[in-house]
Amino acid sequence: MVEPFEIPTEWIKFRAMDWGQAKPYACLWFAVDYDGNLYCYRELYGWGGKANIGTGETAREVGEKICKLEKRSEKVQGGVLDNACWARTGVTAPTIEEELDAVLIKHKLIPFRKCSKGRIEGANAFKQRLIGNEMKDGSFKPAIYFFKTCYHSIRTIPMIGHDKHNPELPDTTAEDHCYDAVAYACSSRPFSPMRAKMKRDSYDCYRTEKKRSAWTY
């Protein structure tokens, strides 16, 4: 967790969303710094005041809430959304994605795109960022951070365990909506851990002995 700060205008910003009606929905906003680290700086969590209980809001109602939080001047470069939102439940009824994006487009915001990765890939992408990059002292520095104002992300993500039947996956019976949104975000921004670069002594091309410095005698 980090204290909120003013995000530089040059950083890339995007959103990631896990849809829910009977259960909560989670829309999270992320910024990408110059080193590729992710900062979750805002959340919109649709819960009914009790753990894992949704609000029953329609996709259009939720879309309007997203637009109230996200301004055009913020220059959010679209977002990733749960694949299931593209499923059509009736012959003529619009999909969740169509309803959400219709509102975003009306407000001149960039719509969502489909998250193309599966749950295992998303879980691994999140795990890699939690481990992060190796430092010179052998420790590791995470590549993802959460503003302290992201209450529900901080409340729910640490409580999620492993699936009883597949330890590669999170427990889907838990309140995993913020977790899923983070997994979509991590999948959309591939991360390659960097090993610490240790300072090396300079060597001559033809000799194994150290080069003599101009300041040594």
PLM regions and their residue ranges:
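Short beta-strand scaffold segments in enzyme catalytic cores
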Residues: 25-31
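Acidic, Mg2+-coordinating catalytic module of metal-dependent nucleases/exonucleases
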Residues: 169-198
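Short, flexible loop/turn elements at secondary-structure junctions
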Residues: 19-21, 83
